[in-house]
C-alpha cells in the first residue's frame, strides 16, 4: 500500500545538510538559529503590548509554527546572513559611538 508520503516539518524541513551550507559550522548554525528564534518569540510576545522592538518573521508562517522552524526557513532561504564580529573592532566602534554621544551632549549644554 503506497500512498502519499508526508514530509516531517521542523528541524528536518529544511534539511540539515542544506542549512549547514549557510554557515561554517554546526555550532554557529545552532547559535544563529536559536538567537533568531528568540527574536521571533519576543516579537510575538510584544504584539499584544503594542511594542515592536524586534522584526517579525521574514517568511510566510503557518498556524502554530514554532519560532525555531521559522528561523531555520529564513536561514535556508538566505533572508538572514551570519557574519563574524571581531570583539576588538566592536569595542572600538562602541567607544567611538559613546565619544560621539558625549561630544553631542556637551555641545548642547554650552
Swiss-Prot record:
The keyword Transcription applies. Keywords: DNA-directed RNA polymerase, Nucleotidyltransferase, Transcription, Transferase. GO terms for biological process: DNA-templated transcription. GO terms for cellular component: DNA-directed RNA polymerase complex. InterPro entries: DNA-dir_RNA_pol_omega, Pol_omega/Rpo6/RPB6, RPB6/omega-like_sf. It catalyses: RNA(n) + a ribonucleoside 5'-triphosphate = RNA(n+1) + diphosphate. One of its GO terms (molecular function) is DNA binding. It is an enzyme of class 2 (transferase). It holds the Pfam family RNA_pol_Rpb6. Its EC number is 2.7.7.6. The RNAP catalytic core consists of 2 alpha, 1 beta, 1 beta' and 1 omega subunit. When a sigma factor is associated with the core the holoenzyme is formed, which can initiate transcription. Belongs to the RNA polymerase subunit omega family. Promotes RNA polymerase assembly. Latches the N- and C-terminal regions of the beta' subunit thereby facilitating its interaction with the beta and alpha subunits. This is DNA-directed RNA polymerase subunit omega. It comes from Nocardioides sp. (strain ATCC BAA-499 / JS614). The lineage of its organism: Bacteria, Bacillati, Actinomycetota, Actinomycetes, Propionibacteriales. The gene is rpoZ.
